[in-house]
UniProtKB/Swiss-Prot annotation:
Residues 381-452 form the TRAM domain. PROSITE patterns: MTTASE_N, MTTASE_RADICAL, RADICAL_SAM, TRAM. This is Ribosomal protein uS12 methylthiotransferase RimO. It comes from Prochlorococcus marinus (strain MIT 9215). Residues 14-125 form the MTTase N-terminal domain. Its cofactor is [4Fe-4S] cluster.
């Protein structure tokens, strides 16, 4: 990617590159900063070696993410780059980062990325900048420039920012601030713009998508948003970060009634046992887990279910973990992500007693992965012999088509690998939907033959 200025403003001296760590919310922030700098005449380049300024957009959710962020910061400062640190680590450690790494030229908080051009201008003048709001309040709308890589054919669409929950293990409310939703009109406007750019799939994201609109409309309004988005000419609309409390009859009906909202439910349940959920400060969830999963399966038989889990939470006993394994076996999720509890300073769980040893936590993670691999393999093998609609995203070095069915979300799930008879114009397949016959499956991916472009 090399992004040239889209306007007639005089080119600035700095050539800027971005290094991104973390989730898709962070990625959207990066894309907005790229768009804002481009608007102001800066040359934004994906080749960090060619840049003299690197903006490292960091993650501070867990320790491993912080370590990766620090590695990148040090890598670029050691190369003599002028480094600006953005994102969650800047928000989290706004008073410590520049003291510990004095080579850093500037900090930008999670609610301040719209100021990137002004921050860079000050850095160019030799100033050390700390632009971090105490409480993040900003959320970009469709009017804020954004660079979207159209070669990926998929774009994330942020519908809200921040979180009003206080889960015991999670530091996100401190890093991202309180929930603030965009209007339905703003979101639909951006979706239409993405459709005009050739985007084939949009993925709705926020900290809790099912709480969308509570702050501005006085009640959760995801169902109304989905009904409006279903009118936008984008083939696939996917939703991430849905919570059981928000999967109302109206929301489920919107999934059923809309042709372009794919029946893919990303439900970060974290655990199944009531005792553990209570310790996580999610006591409301235990009674809902069973009923909402059964309801989704009953109402939408083609539904794909994904969840994320935490093992090794303080106080998690053997019987709690066995309850979790039984829960997985009973509900047979299509996809599961599992993480070991990471104690975070500033969260309620940091000081909880009855810590689970790292060895036990690691073994439990491996156990969950093993159980889920068997389930996922059975799920995937059930598609063998069927025809599926596949979005082709790239061409492999072996001249195979690499894509996804609606069953797979990008980055976190598997892929579909397809052979094709006519290899002359393979590039014509990129960004297109094809019909494919599935002939083989393993626990992660599907394999088959391309039948035709749809």
């Amino acid at each position: 990617m090399k992004q040239n200025s889209l306007n007639v403003k005089e080119k600035k001296l700095s050539k800027v590159a971005f290094s991104h760590v973390g989730c898709e919310k962070n990625l959207v922030d990066t894309e907005h900063m790229q768009g804002l700098l481009d608007k102001e005449g800066y040359e934004v380049d994906s080749n960090i070696n060619e840049a003299n300024v690197v903006v490292v957009n960091t993650c501070s959710f867990i320790q491993t993410a912080r370590e990766e962020s620090i590695r990148k910061i040090l890598e670029y400062t050691n190369q003599g780059k002028e480094v600006i640190v953005a994102g969650c680590m800047a928000q989290h450690f706004k008073d410590e980062l520049i003291k510990e790494i004095p080579e850093i030229k500037g900090l930008i908080g999670t609610g301040d990325y719209q100021k990137i051009a002004k921050v860079l201008d000050r850095v160019e003048k030799g100033e050390i900048v700390n632009e971090v709001s105490k409480i993040p309040e900003f959320i970009a709308d469709e009017e804020i420039p954004r660079f979207v890589d159209k070669n990926k054919f998929v774009a994330y669409l942020r519908i809200a920012e921040g979180c009003n929950y206080n889960c015991a293990f999670c530091i996100i409310p401190k890093l991202r601030g309180p929930q603030r939703s965009r209007t339905i009109e703003s979101i639909v406007s951006e979706a239409k713009s993405l459709a005009k750019q050739g985007i084939q799939e949009i993925i709705l994201i926020s900290q809790i998508t099912t709480n969308y609109g509570q702050d501005i409309y006085g009640k959760p309004s995801l169902a109304k948003l989905l009904n409006e988005l279903s009118k936008v000419p984008i083939p696939w609309i996917r939703i991430h970060y849905a919570y059981p409390t928000g999967l109302t009859d109206q929301v489920i009906r919107a999934f059923k009634d809309s042709k372009n909202i794919v029946p893919y439910f990303d439900l970060p349940l974290q655990h199944s046992h009531p005792d553990v959920l209570k310790s996580m400060n999610r006591p409301w969830q235990a009674s809902l887990n069973e009923s909402i999963l059964e309801k989704i399966r009953e109402e939408i038989p083609s539904a794909v279910l994904r969840t994320s889990l935490i093992v090794g939470f303080p106080g998690e006993k053997k019987e709690h973990f066995e309850h979790l394994l039984e829960f997985l076996d009973r509900h047979k999720f299509d996809h599961v992500g599992v993480f070991i509890f990471s104690p975070e300073v500033g969260t309620a769980a940091f000081d909880l007693p009855n810590k689970v040893s790292p060895e036990v936590a690691e073994a439990r993670k491996d156990n969950v992965i093993s159980v889920q691999q068997n389930i996922s393999k059975d799920k995937n093998q059930s598609y063998v012999g069927s025809k599926m609609k596949i979005l082709v995203e790239k061409i492999s070095d072996n001249n195979e088509l690499i894509g996804r069915s609606y069953n797979f979300a990008p980055e976190i799930d598997g892929t579909v690998i397809l052979s094709v008879k006519d290899k002359i114009d393979l590039k014509n397949y990129s960004g297109k939907f094809v019909e494919a016959n599935i002939s083989f499956a393993d626990e992660y991916d599907l394999y088959g033959e391309t039948l035709k472009i749809l």
